[in-house]
Amino acid sequence: MKRIERTLLSLCFLLPVGMPVLADEKLDNKDYVNVNETKQSAIRGRIVDNSGQTLPGATIYIESLHTGVISDINGFYTFANLNPGTYKVSVHYVGYSTAEATITVPEGTTIVRDFTLNEGIELQEVVVGGTFQGQRRALASQKNALGITNVVSADQVGKFPDSNIGDALKRISGINVQYDQGEARFGQVRGTSADMSSVTINGNRVPSAEGETRNVQLDLIPADMIQTIEVNKVVTPDMDADAIGGSINLVTKNSPYKRFITATAGTGYNAVSDKMNLNLGFTYGDRFFNDKLGLMASVSYQNNPAGSDDVEMAYEMDDDGNVYLDEYEIRQYYVTRERQSYSLALDWIINENHKLDFKGIFNNRNDWENRYRLTNKFMDPEDVGGATDRYEMIYEGKAGGPDQRNARLERQRTMDFTLGGEHLFGRLKFDWKASYAKASEYRPNERYLALKLEDVAMDTDWSDIRRPYMSPKSGSFPVLDASNTYGFELDELTEQFEDIQEKDMKFSANFELPLKQGAFNNKLKFGAKVVDKDKHMDIDFFEYTPLDEDAFLTDVLGHLHNQDRDGYMAGDRYRVGNFVDKEYIGGLNLTNASEYEQEEKLDEEAENFDAHETVTSGYIRFDQQLGRHWALMAGLRLENTHVSYSGFVYNDGDQDGSDEESLTPTGKQSKSYINVLPALLLKWDVNDDLKLRASFTNTLARPKYANLVPNVIIDKEDIAFGNPDLKATLSYNVDLSAEYYFKSVGLVSAGLFYKKINDFIVDYRDQNYEYQGTVYDEMSTPINAGDANLFGVEVAYQRDFGFIHPALKCVGLYGNYTYTYSKVNHFNFEGRENDDMRLPGSPEHTANLSLYFEKAGFNLRWSYNFASDFIDEVGESSFYDRYYDKVNYMDVNASYTFGKQFKTTIYADVTNLLNQPLRYYQGTPDRSMQAEYYGVRFNAGVKVTF
């Protein structure tokens, strides 16, 4: 692999020198124009359709120069380095008539020329209408990309019943998503875990509101706030390298070509909450001051009362190999999820050579959650006279203060504000961006009140092995009641305050210099970027003891409410019973010293940390056209990472006999490292419809924030360490793909990919671990666990059936399938070195299938999504491995669009028709760890475009 790197490094620097020589040998003077003393000129402009919508991925071609360019995501194009003269320019786009213009360019002048294309032409007797507009734009961008990219437009997202970006992503080949409360939260690309891929907004990496990871919560961003989704499965040197799986780029709405107004209103229903939801959206765009200033503003609001029915288990094995339930929980969740999102795009065209733009997006999600949890926890036989069937029964309610609606409030926010410029100085193009981004999670007044009953003899019913059920041997199920018949006592009364923040400052500059024109044209691109990150996690945790516990318990038991819900989806026999009212928990005046004694819980605060990270990068990229059909790109990226972390050492005092808790700052620990990352991409345009690609790239994934914190947590017989010496995970990637684009809009594609992944990270656990002379029962720490090979195959097909018979043009199919195989090598995990293990986060199979009917404004679509199970967390042995189970999602949606001046769409959708639970299992599929059900959901509404 190092030999390959050295070869590619040489190519990166030799190609810019060698290719001009090759071009001189292959071409005569008619095929290219040399750079000379003449002041160079340029042609710039924008490609739009007859409705004013921009057309990304259009091919703009000058025949006399054998030179073409591709319009960018916002429809803009530029020909630089032109000699003065007259040129015939043609514009080509799938499903549109070719547009042509003859443009005369004076010396040293930039000519602005926009093109408007007319749609609806006949292609092989198949009429391409406006119904396929979004799909057409996406495929045009994908078709002309140098690397392997999947592009999804907002119009396409609107064809599916997806309310957030995570749900939209699961429709793309090679992407699997993990869920939270029935909504897609984290995306996994090409068989890699979520922390091995990046999520960007307009090319900027999005900070994470999560405390421990770099993962971005995709359910924060409503789908209707995004113009285009780009999934770059092959990253080029001008992109951030932290994208082993790929880079998911969310392009927000750009300023329009002409006035644009849309409004959306909708509602829906969820059976768990038995309440209606609300969805609102509005977008306004226009141009002002003789089209110098462009503006696009959007707002989205969603209020979704929902919930879930959940059972969870944890298993242990005794010395004789018998499996028993160590913990058993029945949970009832009620969640109200509110999203607010605002975006603004501005651009100012100073003149034909200079433009400034601003893009900003702000997303806020409030989760008000009440959880009612009944737990049976296995008791140590030594504590109950040697009995092996005794459990502690705990009724716990989660709530918040009155200002948080007596529910646990989790407020997560992400924002990104970017100011940039594009400038043309002769033949040199220069662009820059300065941005500020922030993500935060705020949890105030998170309260828990729990009552317990010890030494309850329990039986386990294993008749349905996937749904074990525990019941008291006495036959009488202990419940909470006002008279405290069973003798429950206070177990927990706590309150937590959490504040997590990550702030990013970024600046980047890019230069692009065309060197030669003609069939062997080439250009050099280079640039630099600085990213400065600050992240901190601050938790304050307090435990309260009532001064008169008997009076408090009597008062508590006078405020009970039955939380059993008819039709509990995990099974009718799972019942949570009576719990303390959320209003009572929220109304407690815990700061009243005459009623409660407060104790700060240092063990809960031991994971607090401060982190600072600076990534300074630079790159060089050389693009060489090899005639009309071949294109080559060679490049190199250098990234210098400097990290500085500080945490805490916590000791509960048990092991040293002091019985005194301590929490001691670690001080800052710093580390720096440099990654040299070559890339080589090759594209063969066999013809206008068939595209072949091959690439070699080198990418990385930085460790999770919490893993690098140099903390030590000693809690009774257990000890946990952070690991500031963790290495970044590196990957060497080889990709091959073939795509054939149908003229009637659609494609069939196949791809192979291979990743050699070094130093992937897992949480390591060990028994009887000695630290500073003391032996601890269990130790845990993150480690670089070894290497892995990941191989995959992707196939995709999307097309209407008009090729069978014109009458079937209104019926079509969208489908894709991805197979991945991974194997861990040199597993650095004591006791598991010889285990045959897959890479964590790597499902073997993912698939999508969608059948649609579209005609005369009516759209009906059936969609299916599948992903196989995968290992999610590595345990100390295979018995403790945690797996994310396979999923099957089925949705149906319909819409009807009518009107011209006021284009109106009425829509309705039904999602999760199979009532797919979020399910984890321990070791084997029959050993359920969690089964959380959300039920079928309904939505309907109307959208109007002016």
Predicted regions and their residues:
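Conserved C-terminal beta-signal and adjacent last beta-strands/turns
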Residues: 7, 492-500, 508-514, 521-524, ...
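N-terminal periplasmic accessory domains that precede
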Residues: 111-115, 165-168, 185-188, 200, ...
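Gram-negative outer-membrane beta-barrel transporters
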Residues: 754-756, 774-870
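Outer membrane beta-barrel strand-and-loop segments of large Gram-negative receptors
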Residues: 606, 610, 721-727, 747-812, ...
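Transmembrane beta-barrel wall of Gram-negative outer-membrane proteins
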Residues: 274-380, 402, 412-419, 426, ...
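Short acidic/polar hinge/loop motifs at secondary-structure boundaries
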Residues: 80, 205-233
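Extracytoplasmic beta-strand/coil segments of soluble accessory domains associated
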Residues: 166-205
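Short, acidic, small-residue-rich periplasmic hinge/interaction motif at the N-terminus
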Residues: 24-40, 48-53, 58-63, 92-96, ...
